[in-house]
Amino acid sequence: MSASDLTSVQATAPQGRRQILVTSALPYANGQIHIGHLVEYIQTDIWVRTLRMHGHEVYYIGADDTHGTPVMLRAEKEGLTPKQLIDRVWTEHKRDFDSFGVSFDNFYSTDSDENRVLSESIYLALKENGLIAERAIEQAYDPVKEMFLPDRFIKGECPKCHAKDQYGDNCEVCGSTYLPTELLNPYSVVSGATPVRKTSTHYFFRLSDPRCESFLREWVSGLAQPEATNKMREWLGDAGEAKLADWDISRDAPYFGFEIPGAPGKYFYVWLDAPVGYYASFKNLCDREGIDFDAWIRAGSTAEQYHFIGKDILYFHTLFWPAMLEFSGHRTPTNVFAHGFLTVDGAKMSKSRGTFITAQSYIDTGLNPEWLRYYFAAKLNATMEDIDLNLDDFQARVNSDLVGKYVNIASRAAGFLIKRFDGRVQDSAMNHPLVAKLRDAIASIAAHYEGREYSRALRQTMELADEVNAYVDGAKPWELAKDPANAVALHETCSVSLEAFRLLSLALKPVMPRVAEAVEAFFGVAPLAWADAAKPLSSAQPIKAYQHLMTRVDPKQIDALLAANRDSLQADAAGAAAAGTTAANAAKDAKSAKANAKAVAANGADDAPISIDDFAKVDLRIAKIVACQAVEGSDKLLQLTLDIGEEKTRNVFSGIKSAYQPEQLVGKLTVMVANLAPRKMKFGLSEGMVLAASAADEKAEPGLYILEPHSGAKPGMRVK
């Protein structure tokens, strides 16, 4: 829906009442909600409230994602059963969502009978359709804990840079990716034991089946975000490429989750039953409230289904989930909306700097949750762009927009109306041109919200607030009040101001629902909907005494928030020390810390900022790939011959073979680290490093992308 679709106030009323099911990604049940999570839940909640204000039948569904090895191991560490842990975390998560006004119709758990039944039925339907395969695979196995180990539960020495204590899938020092079998001196993070290789039968969803590929090629054409469509097409490849791989949907005991029907000791991988949890939570609500569940989720249903997610889990929601639904006889998502990541003050959230901010610490510090809702909304749009919470800008924007512009309007007019006119507006003032302008703008503001262009909606709203304040400044009600002869003009000014304030409150209601409730009580009106733009204040209903709606952000509150989250880091560290660790892990941690000290100093820890002098040590150069070939005997490496403007070319080995054919790269410009010490490899000498991007979780969002400068750059140019 675009602004042109809504050209009048009347257009804000629904032409037909839609049935809409909306979800946000499920938070994992082994940690606290932080402000990075809240971006998504606030984004979704604003959209849901917008649709409800149109009068549609909307259900916003959520749940905790409870299964998997991390939950099982954390519960063991805390001396709890997994059930006890997830029940406690559910209470904490529900508290945090309530604090920030996230209006779930049902917030449930994936560890439920409804989810078990639905997961089993979907699995059995896929099996009936010939889309489940059994295969023997070899995995790392902890002989002490008698369990198979996920990649992130294995550590060892990086096979590339030889940094100690690195995860089984990637090195945090040099950034290399590799297989767990390539780690040197590996050990289990659970027990400290050396893993052994063990074969096990696993179950796979046959995503490579031509039926799945054909369906997904058609389904992707309906995605609203071009970035998502492009990424999907990249994963699918061209017709005939057969790029889709089958998906391992099983895990071996011990595992906290649902056992696979007919497969004792085998459990559904958490990513199979987690999205089914959307339906399970909705089923729980339907059973309580007498809603026809099947009418909403069966194939061919006219109900709409939307998923809001982070861009890091696009892979699961646009490949596996739609295909699972399609071939198990369910409706597929109407659309999937992905958002970007959150940074704080331009950097990754950091515990050492206090910017890894938990939802509860924000509330405990006394900060208004609607301040954060407003700030995030002012940054959000319909793309997958990352957004930044700049704490200075947060303070300035809240104080300027919400207090200085918006709330100030009511405080300047309400007292005069109550004192001089018995709290009753002048009915003729409801036809004032300024009021008409605001009334007409509501339709386009509502359309911006529905199009997920929240920043546009708020920009338009604040531009209107500026006009209202200019009107008040020009009319000067405080001067008019000095002379009884100006009573009519004073009455009009106050009435226009308060009706404008009502319309601005309507425009802000999806973002600041609690302020809207207070405004509704102040005016003595029913909950505002979009159609109420055409229902102005009336002299028949006097306003109530004005109560202050919002305070300014105090810089001391921001300081306290950062301090509280730095304190939480210290508390976590103290708790970890008190809880203790295995002797094997403690010894390895101490040894690896010493071994990695130089590497960390050179590369920088995630949370430690580097100086400009440190950055200046890295010599980044534009390089032209003049030749490229596969490396015989390596599944990952390409050999690049690079021209960086020197007398001789450079030879570089790069682990990008999975993403590029050699002929694709010849002639391209890229960026390389030119002053990296040469490294002797078994295939030859590597004289630098080319830069490439990848997702933090390459399993969830696979892909490598070399950096390419804009046209005009030439080999040898410095990047600075």
Curated annotation (Swiss-Prot):
Q: Which residues bind Zn(2+)?
A: C158, C161, C171, C174
Question: What InterPro entries does the record tag this protein with?
Answer: aa-tRNA-synth_I_CS, Anticodon_Met, M/V/L/I-tRNA-synth_anticd-bd, Met-tRNA-synth_bsu_C, Met-tRNA_ligase_1, Met-tRNA_synth, Methionyl/Leucyl_tRNA_Synth, MetRS_core
Q: Which residues bind ATP?
A: K351
Q: Where in the cell is it found?
A: Cytoplasm
Q: Which cofactor does it need?
A: Zn(2+)
Q: From the record, what ranges are coiled-coil? A: none
Q: Which family does it belong to?
A: Belongs to the class-I aminoacyl-tRNA synthetase family. MetG type 1 subfamily.
Q: What is this protein called?
A: Methionine--tRNA ligase
